[in-house]
Amino acid sequence: MTDTTKIKQRQRDGAAKTLLSKARNVSLTVVTLALLGLASPFVELAGNLGAAEAVAQEAPEKKQKTRRVPSLSEAVYKKLGAGQELIDAKDLDGALLEIQEALERSRRYNENEIANLHNMLGYIYYLKEDYNGALREYKIVVSQGEKIPEGLETTTLYTVAQLSYVQENYDDALKYMEIWISKAQNPSADPRFFMATVYYQMKDFDKAIEQMELGIQIAEERGTTVKEQQWSLLTFLYFEKEDWPNVIETLKILVEKFPKREHWVRLAGVYGQEGYEKEQMYSLEAAYTAGFLEKKSDFTNLAGLLMQEEVPYRAAKVLVAGFKAEAIERDSTILQSLGQAWQLAQEVDNAIEVFEEAAKLADDGKIYERLSYLYLEDDQYDRCVDSASGALDKGGLRKEQSVHIVKGMCQYNLDKLTAARDSFVQCRRVARRSDDKPNQRVCGQWITFIDRETERLKQLAAAG
């Protein structure tokens, strides 16, 4: 062979190798798994045909014995090059025919040549979205064992594992990923996360947790980032096992590293479920401060916890924020809760305003009854009488006689003695029907007092 011939041969070899490299490095579709339950954690799988090499190379390389493999003939180079040209031209059927024709002469080929032809054939099937066909061809590639380059073997093993997962052949996905791990140079955490996802699909939560914990350990040892979806998957797995202490720990990591509404609200929910009410309140308050509260239950739960902790002013502010955010409807029940919070916070004017709105919406007179007491304490006797009358008109009261007493007292303070006496007479009548002796006595004392006061005023008027 002349020097010129050798140069041309090397050029052809180089061109064919470049084509082969391109074929092996075309991206696979990124596969995401949406998990059910907690606001939706997911795992992103490695997305390139060359991803296996990248995953392994994140760690320091360890020395391995160089593998000797048979070389590719010029005829195979040409077939691979022709196949790649047809792929680039989007002629997948033509590319398929080209490689299939080449494989008809497979008896002439060594293991490496057979592997490279089946590798391209697998890629063509993949582009045609025939994943079963792609898997069949890629499995032929790895079956050539030690007679193909290590890079081709490990890359194809990784691809077979991923495609098996996509095809829901979980046993094969695990099998080929385990083989890949045994051959890879210091693999990173990603294969462990992949296997955890597979075990999750198989409902083997114990093994899924084991793989997730191992993956996180590897990532932390190398100083690489553990993604939000990976922590979320681990949280979900602990949740499935009802391992609440670990659910709390992983959620604490999530709110620290990825402070989002879903993580704060879940953390608060688990704290509440486990009886840690103060921690539940602190979590919801943190979410409130960050502007993460969105739902009615978010605001009402926090307000309720604040009321339990005897901080009614903050509870009222939370409910007001819920109204402003239009997360809470202004119904009588919520308005009554807001009114009670303002009342306990000594914000009487705010309480009265809210109770007035709530009383109109309520089906019974209980809120009007509460208003009558507030107006009595605030020396607003006209409004006290109106509220007491509203309570009696709507009914549904626990003790009707008590409302008559309040109404009578306000009427007395307005110097309406006749009306006040009528209210106390009605009070005594209702108290007798319910055998309420204490209120019978109170109302009787008021009637006697008003009669004496009326007589005294008559005498004063006569003397004048």
Protein language model features and the residues they cover:
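Residue-level recognition of tetratricopeptide repeat
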Residues: 84, 123, 162, 197, ...
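Solenoid-like repeat scaffolds
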Residues: 65-71, 103-110, 142-149, 178-186, ...
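Generic helix N-cap/helix-start motif at coil->alpha-helix transitions
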Residues: 72-81, 111-118, 149-159, 184-194, ...
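Alpha-helical adaptor scaffolds
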Residues: 154, 332-346, 353-401
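N-terminal leader/linker segments that initiate helical-solenoid repeat arrays
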Residues: 2-10, 32-143, 151-155, 201, ...
